[in-house]
Each structure stands twice: as structure tokens, then as C-alpha cells.
From Swiss-Prot:
Gene3D superfamilies listed in its UniProt record: Adenosylhomocysteinase-like, NAD(P)-binding Rossmann-like Domain
Annotated PROSITE patterns: ADOHCYASE_1, ADOHCYASE_2
Keywords (A to Z) from UniProt: Cytoplasm, Hydrolase, NAD, One-carbon metabolism
Known function: May play a key role in the regulation of the intracellular concentration of adenosylhomocysteine.
Main localization of the protein described in the UniProt heading: cytoplasm
Originating species: Leptospira interrogans serogroup Icterohaemorrhagiae serovar Lai (strain 56601)
Protein name: Adenosylhomocysteinase
Entry EC no(s): 3.13.2.1
Annotated positions binding NAD(+): 162-164, 196, 225-230, 248, 283, 304-306, 352
Length: 436
């Protein structure tokens, strides 16, 4: 499939519209596990706080994202959507959204050319452009800044989902190139400390096991990076009985890893001995071609950071004498001239979405509730140019919306106790500088 033309009136492009009913049934299941989004639908029922909003969205087109999209439309927004990764789309989810009449341009296994074509389609709302951006990774934001700068004057705000995209926002701001106020959704406590940590704790092992059927117990695994994603990834592998080793550049994160019982080494210290390597840094060139050549025969290599730059895939694919054989979609065996081979998952892209279905619905409800609140805040209030985080009371609100489903009963302060702590009786309970 190859698509290169602009089609301003195209309403959708998905792999198979006949999968819409399957997608719809899974969306209904997911709604039961996404109490935050469903609570916002109920809270704003009939109020339409996003009426008039034209949201260009670029975020993994999964079942959980379908619940987000339909929440945005129920709150009054007009939405056009693409995925932020060539492998992360769940085709039945995309089909269900297309069937519901919401413009979506996404399918699993896009080429790079098709990926950018899909992003282009999110920008056209008839003869108008978007007035809001909802992004994951920063590609849509960068695309509009670089290719359609004239549209930026109409855009009220950007909400960015992930660590990599947030880094890009701060870089643009520092260089004076960011032209639209933005919300850093990733650094909401109820996003980074839940999605990044608890989501990866469940979805990393799911992706590796679906792809390879490998038994993790007893294996030696290397996790590169011990931020929130790395912490969740290390726990994911350890919980299945793997012996986990961590690499880090940050002495604080390295000390945390050591205090959690992980050995902290450098890649070159251990690469020849490990069975599984996971990159989780958001950086470039973490695993080089030289590292791959040194890996054990049959070792598994994957990435759970946003982009495919953490592993030197281009060098691997262009190395003379190296052969590539597809075992199944997103599972490739690379054989070196000496006869040794390694297994690379999802072409070095997000393994949990490329080889499985990503994070569970409940934790994505936390993240996406933040997204909706950020969109409402940016659309209805004029912000000066800058990068903001959601205020503490909204962060606490997101958490509170998810407690009942888990059977949580919160202790309530009395006025004397609140006065003693110096906090409002109903919160916020922590200062902005508090580190959870």
C-alpha cells in the first residue's frame, strides 16, 4: 500500500472496515475499565466544553485511544486522528472509529511515507485547520510548525502525552521556536507514575512473550535506563523470574536501581552475557551495531522508548554480510557472518504496542483523563506561550476518579488536622515540588 497525495475530503483510511463490530465490542469492554474518562463524560454531559474545538490528534490508535476519541467528541470536539507509530494501530479499533463517522487515518504496518501521509490528513477540517493539537511523541507538533506555520496562529494549545514529545517541546521553547502554549501531560503524577511505571510493568513482558514465547524465568535481562519506564520494565521482567541488570547515566536513578536490588553496570560490561536487552532511555544509539555483534546467539533485543533511535537499526540493516529473516510480523532474526543470530522485535520500535496491545485500559484511563482535562483547560483559557503542567488539584482529581473501582476508601481530614498540615481540607494535599 502506498499513498502520497493529499485528500482533504477523505473521511478515513483504515485496513479493514469489516472489523468495526469487533472493535466496538472491545471498546465497550474498555469503557468499563476506564472510569476517569467515563466520569468526565458524565460530569460534562450537556455542557460541551470542547464545542468548536478542532482537534488534530496523533496518538497510538488503540482500543483505549478510541475511548479517548469518543470522550472528546462527546464533549463537543471535532476530531481527526492518526497513529504516532507505524506498528501501534489496532486495526479493529481504527475500523470502529471510522464506522462511527470520526475521521481516522491509521493501520498497523504503515510505511514511513504512509505514516507522514496519515499525519497530514489530520490537519484538514474542510477549509480550516485545527485549533487544538493532541500529540504523542511530538511528530504532529513538529510537522505543523515546519510545514504549516501559518496554521499556528489559530491553534490555542498542544497537549503532549509522552516523555520524548515533552523533551521536544522544551527544546523548541528554549530555541524560541515553539509558537503555541502547551501542556506537558507526561509529567502529571497520574500519568508518569502510573502509565510509565505500572503500564510498562504489565505490557513489556506481554510484548516479549507474545512475540517469542520465551520463558523469562531464569533469563538474564538488561534494561537500559531506570526512569519511570525503566523502573516498570525492570519490575516486569523481575516479576517473571528474570535476573535484571540496569544501565544508567544518572547517579540518582542508578542509586535507586541499586537500592531496589538491581545490579547497575555499563552495556559493554554485560552485553555478551544477557539473554534479553530492553532500551528505555528516550536517547539515541544506546545499543550500537558493535553491541549487537557481541550479543549471545539467540538473544532478544527490543525497545520500549517512543522512537526507534535507541537501537542502531539503520546500521544493522545496512551492515554487509548480515541477513534478515522475518519469523512473523514484527519478529525478525538477524544473522551475522559468523553464524550467530539475534532476534529484534518491532524493528526497534515500541515493543509493547508493536508485538502486543500496549498498556491495560485502567492505567490508560489515568493518562487520557489528564489529556481531556488539558484539552479543556487550553481550549477554554488563554495561556501565554510556554510549557505547563496540570495544576495539582486536577492531578488529584484524576486519581480520585479511579479509586472507587478499586474499592479504595480515603481517610478524610478534619479541620484541625488540615490546619495542622497547612492544607485545604479537600486538597490539594501536596505542594507542587513534592516528589511522589
Amino acid at each position: 500500500m502506498s499513498v502520497t497525495t493529499q485528500e482533504k475530503d477523505l473521511s478515513y483510511k483504515v485496513k479493514d472496515l469489516s472489523q468495526a463490530e469487533w472493535g466496538r465490542q472491545e471498546i465497550i469492554l474498555a469503557e468499563k475499565e476506564m472510569p476517569g474518562l467515563m466520569a468526565l463524560r458524565q460530569e460534562y454531559k450537556g455542557k460541551k466544553p470542547l464545542a468548536g474545538a478542532r482537534i488534530a490528534g496523533s496518538l497510538h490508535m488503540t482500543i483505549q485511544t478510541a475511548v479517548l476519541i469518543e470522550t472528546l467528541t462527546e464533549l463537543g470536539a471535532e476530531v481527526r486522528w492518526s497513529s504516532c507509530n507505524i506498528f501501534s494501530t489496532q486495526d479493529h479499533a481504527a475500523a470502529a472509529i471510522a464506522k462511527a463517522g470520526i475521521p481516522v487515518f491509521a493501520w498497523k504496518g504503515e510505511t514511513e511515507e504512509e505514516y507522514w501521509w496519515c499525519i497530514e490528513q489530520t490537519i484538514f477540517f474542510g477549509d480550516k485547520g485545527p485549533n487544538m493539537i493532541l500529540d504523542d511523541g511530538g511528530d504532529l507538533t513538529a510537522y505543523i510548525h515546519e510545514k504549516y506555520p501559518k496554521l499556528l496562529s489559530e491553534i490555542r494549545g498542544i497537549s503532549e502525552e509522552t516523555t520524548t514529545g515533552v523533551k521536544s517541546l522544551y527544546k523548541l521553547l528554549k530555541k524560541g521556536e515553539l509558537k503555541v502554549p502547551a501542556f506537558n501531560v507526561n509529567d502529571s503524577v497520574t500519568k508518569s507514575k502510573f502509565d510509565n511505571l505500572y503500564g510498562c510493568r504489565e505490557s513489556l513482558a506481554d510484548g516479549i512473550k507474545r512475540a517469542t514465547d520465551v520463558m523469562l524465568a531464569g533469563k538474564v535481562a538488561l534494561v537500559c535506563g531506570f526512569g519511570d519506564v525503566g523502573k516498570g520494565s525492570a519490575a516486569s521482567l523481575r516479576n517473571f523470574g528474570a535476573r535484571v541488570i540496569v544501565t544508567e547515566i544518572d547517579p540518582i536513578c542508578a542509586l535507586q536501581a541499586s537500592m531496589e536490588g538491581y545490579q547497575v553496570l555499563r552495556v559493554e560490561d554485560i552485553i555478551e552475557q544477557v539473554d534479553i536487552v530492553v532500551t528505555a532511555t528516550g536517547n539515541d544509539d544506546i545499543i550500537t551495531l558493535e553491541h549487537m555483534k557481541a550479543m549471545k546467539d539467540g538473544a532478544i533485543l527490543c525497545n520500549i522508548g517512543h522512537f526507534d533511535t535507541e537501537i542502531q537499526m539503520s546500521r544493522l540493516n545496512n551492515e554487509k554480510g548480515v541477513t534478515k529473516k522475518e519469523i512473523k510480523p514484527q519478529v525478525d532474526k538477524y544473522t551475522f557472518p559468523d553464524g550467530k543470530s539475534i532476534i529484534v522485535l518491532a524493528e526497534g520500535r515500541l515493543v509493547n504496542l508493536g508485538c502486543a496491545t500496549g498498556h491495560p485500559s485502567f492505567v490508560m484511563s489515568c493518562s487520557f483523563t489528564n489529556q481531556v482535562l488539558a484539552q479543556i483547560e487550553l481550549y477554554n483559557n488563554k495561556y501565554e506561550l510556554g510549557v505547563y503542567t496540570l495544576p495539582k488539584h486536577l492531578d488529584e482529581k484524576v486519581a480520585a476518579l479511579h479509586l472507587e473501582q478499586l474499592g479504595v476508601r480515603l481517610t478524610k481530614l478534619n479541620q484541625k488536622q488540615a490546619d495542622y498540615l497547612g492544607v485545604p481540607i479537600n486538597g490539594p494535599f501536596k505542594p507542587d515540588h513534592y516528589r511522589y
